[in-house]
Design a protein with these regions (language model features):
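N-terminal accessory segments
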Residues: 1-80
Length: 80
């Protein structure tokens, strides 16, 4: 089934936002840090990166939604 015009625009916007999140992760070395660490909390990842935990948690949420980062909700651990 073909997407409607508005569905196509929403898809483009979502992919654009994801591209920005990937760029942020690359520029801040968050991907490298997460790959080096065992499954970790957002606090641990932010501390290792020297970044504000709130922003790291928001970034992680976007990447979990895109299924790029894995998340275990019970201990609140993130991993690649």
């Amino acid at each position: 089934m073909e997407k409607s015009f508005d569905e196509e625009l929403v898809d483009i916007m979502n992919k654009s936002a994801l591209a920005l999140m990937i760029s942020i992760g690359h520029r801040t070395k968050l991907f490298d840090i997460i790959a080096e660490l065992p499954a970790s909390t957002s606090d641990d990842i932010a501390a290792k990166a020297g970044l504000n935990e709130r922003y790291v948690r928001e970034w992680l949420g976007a990447l979990v939604t895109a299924k790029i980062i894995d998340y275990d909700p019970s201990p609140k651990l993130y991993s690649i």
